[in-house]
Amino acid sequence: MSARIVVTGTDTGIGKTVFAAALAGALDATYWKPVQSGLEDETDSGAVQRLSGLAADRILPERYRLQTPASPHLAAEIDGVDIDVAALELPSVSRPLVVEGAGGLMVPLTRETTYIDVFARWAAPLVLCARTSLGTINHTLLSIEAIRARDIPLLGVAFLGDENLDSEQIIVELGHTRRLGRLPRLERLDAAALRAGFAAAFEPRDFLGDAP
C-alpha cells in the first residue's frame, strides 16, 4: 500500500495548506481535503494545485464542499448539509496520499465528532504543523498529547515560520517527537519557490517510513 499521510496543525492560519502543497509536490503524491468550508475565495484544493505543480487529476474532489466559511460543523448546519463522518474513508490511490484536515485537531465535523476522532479511526501517520511564534510551545505540546492519547502514529513536527531554535528544541524534547524541518516564510510564494524552500528544509523519505 502506498504511503498515506495526514497533515494537521496546531491552529488555523499557520500555513498548513502551503506545507501540504509542498509535501504533495515533493512526494509526487495525490492530495485530498475531505471537507472544505468557504468557497468564495480560493479553496485549499485550488491552492494546493497551484502551489504543488501537480496535475489536476492528482487533486481529489472534496467529500463535502460547504459554502459558509466557518467550522465544518457549523457551516454544515447553516448550509443544510449532514456530514456523515462514517463515510469519510481514505481514498485508495496508487501513489502516496496527502490528506489535509481543517484548522486544528479538535475542530468539530459534527456536534459529536472532531477531526482527531476521524484521524484515530484512519490510524494513518500524521504530520503536525506548528508555527514558531510566541505561544507555540503550549499549543504544540497539547496537540502532541492529544495525538498520543489516541494512539495515532506521529511522524513528527513540521515547523512553519521564522527560526526559533529554543521553541523548536523544547517542543521536540518535551514532546518526545521528531523535528521534521522548518519551512521559512517565502518572499515569493509560487510553485518554484515553494519546491526549493521545502527541498532545502525537509527530507522526503522522513514522511514515507513508519512513525518513530
Swiss-Prot record:
Asked if the Swiss-Prot or TrEMBL record annotates the protein with the keyword Metal-binding, the reply is yes
Query: Which Gene Ontology cellular-component terms appear in the entry?
Result: cytosol
Q: Which InterPro entries match?
A: DTB_synth_BioD (IPR004472), P-loop_NTPase (IPR027417)
Co-factor(s): Mg(2+)
Q: Does the keyword ATP-binding apply?
A: yes
Quick one: which pathway? Cofactor biosynthesis; biotin biosynthesis; biotin from 7,8-diaminononanoate: step 1/2
* Binding site residues for substrate: 37
GO terms of molecular function = ATP binding; dethiobiotin synthase activity; magnesium ion binding
Pfam families associated with the record: AAA_26
Catalytic EC class: ligase
| Reactions accelerated catalytically | (7R,8S)-7,8-diammoniononanoate + CO2 + ATP = (4R,5S)-dethiobiotin + ADP + phosphate + 3 H(+)
Residues that bind Mg(2+): 17, 100
Q: CDD domains given for it?
A: DTBS
Q: What is its EC number?
A: 6.3.3.3
Q: Which UniProt keywords apply?
A: ATP-binding, Biotin biosynthesis, Cytoplasm, Ligase, Magnesium, Metal-binding, Nucleotide-binding
Q: Where in the cell is it found?
A: Cytoplasm
Show the active-site residues: 33
One GO term of the biological process aspect: biotin biosynthetic process
Q: Which residues bind ATP?
A: 13-18, 100-103, 184-186
Query: What does this gene product do?
Result: Catalyzes a mechanistically unusual reaction, the ATP-dependent insertion of CO2 between the N7 and N8 nitrogen atoms of 7,8-diaminopelargonic acid (DAPA, also called 7,8-diammoniononanoate) to form a ureido ring.
| Subunit-structure text | Homodimer.
In the record, the note on similarity to other proteins reads: Belongs to the dethiobiotin synthetase family.
Q: What is the designated name of this protein? A: ATP-dependent dethiobiotin synthetase BioD
- Which organism was this protein described from? Rhodopseudomonas palustris (strain ATCC BAA-98 / CGA009)
Which gene does this sequence derive from?
bioD
